[in-house]
Amino acid sequence: MLPIIGIAGNQLIRATDTFQGNQVTYTPQGFVNAVQQADGLPIVLPISSPKTASAYIDQIDKLILAGGQDISPQLYHEPPHPKLLETNLQRDLFEAALISEALKQNKPIFAVCRGMQLLNVVLGGSLYQDLTTYPKWSVKHEQHPTAPQFATHEVEILPDTLLYQLLPDTYLVNSYHHQALKELAPSLKATAFSPDGLVEGIESLDKDVRLFGVQWHPELTHSSNSTDQGLFDFFVQEF
C-alpha cells in the first residue's frame, strides 16, 4: 500500500476572479507532485477545528506542514510587529493541534518554511516577526520575484544530523521568508544555518521523535533538482 501523506492545507479567504469570488482550500502543487513522485498518496487536510486533529492524524501515515501566512505572535506571547504580514489564527491553531497529535501518535513530520517556524513555536520556541529585528541580517532571504530554481544563498549543513545524510555540507537554496526562528524550542536542534546565522533546518534532539524541517522550499524545485526531491523520497519511503 502507498503511504498516506497528509498535507496541511491553506485557505484562500479573499475573493479573486480566478475562483469567481469563492473561498478555496488548497496546497501548492509542488507538494502533491513531490509526494506522488516519491510513491506516496497525498491527502490535503483542510483547515478545521483543532478538535478534529486526532481524527485527521488517525487517517494518515505522515504529516507535511507547508508554507503560507505569517504565524500569529499570540502563539509565542508577543504583540504584533508593525511589519507583520497576513496571519490566519484558525490555521495556526489547527496545525498546532495536528503537530501535537502527530507527535502523540509518533507519526513523522516534515515541515517547510512556515511549517518549520510553526513547529518551533508549538514546541516552545519563538520567531523574529520580521528580519529587520534580526541584528545580524545580511543575506537576501526573500528572493521574490526571482524564480525558485535560481538559488539565492547557501546554507551550511551541520555534521551528525539528518540533513547531513541527505544533502551536501554546503547547499544552495531558494528563499522566500521575512520571518525566522529566534529562540529554538528546547526539544529541537538546529541542523543548518544561513551565512548570517539564521536557522535553516531543524530536527528533534530525541532520535525517536521523527521530525525535520527546512526553511527553503524544496517543493518548488523538486522536479528539476533531484536532491530536493530526495528529501521527499526519504520522508515518504524511509522516515
Curated annotation (Swiss-Prot):
<dbReference type="InterPro" id="IPR011697">
    <property type="entry name" value="Peptidase_C26"/>
</dbReference>
<feature type="active site">
    <location>
        <position position="217"/>
    </location>
</feature>
<feature type="domain" description="Glutamine amidotransferase type-1">
    <location>
        <begin position="12"/>
        <end position="239"/>
    </location>
</feature>
<feature type="active site">
    <location>
        <position position="219"/>
    </location>
</feature>
<dbReference type="GO" id="GO:0006598">
    <property type="term" value="P:polyamine catabolic process"/>
</dbReference>
<protein>
    <recommendedName>
        <fullName>Protein NtpR</fullName>
    </recommendedName>
</protein>
<dbReference type="InterPro" id="IPR044668">
    <property type="entry name" value="PuuD-like"/>
</dbReference>
<dbReference type="Pfam" id="PF07722">
    <property type="entry name" value="Peptidase_C26"/>
</dbReference>
<dbReference type="GO" id="GO:0005829">
    <property type="term" value="C:cytosol"/>
</dbReference>
<feature type="active site" description="Nucleophile">
    <location>
        <position position="113"/>
    </location>
</feature>
<keyword id="KW-0315">Glutamine amidotransferase</keyword>
<dbReference type="InterPro" id="IPR029062">
    <property type="entry name" value="Class_I_gatase-like"/>
</dbReference>
<dbReference type="GO" id="GO:0033969">
    <property type="term" value="F:gamma-glutamyl-gamma-aminobutyrate hydrolase activity"/>
</dbReference>
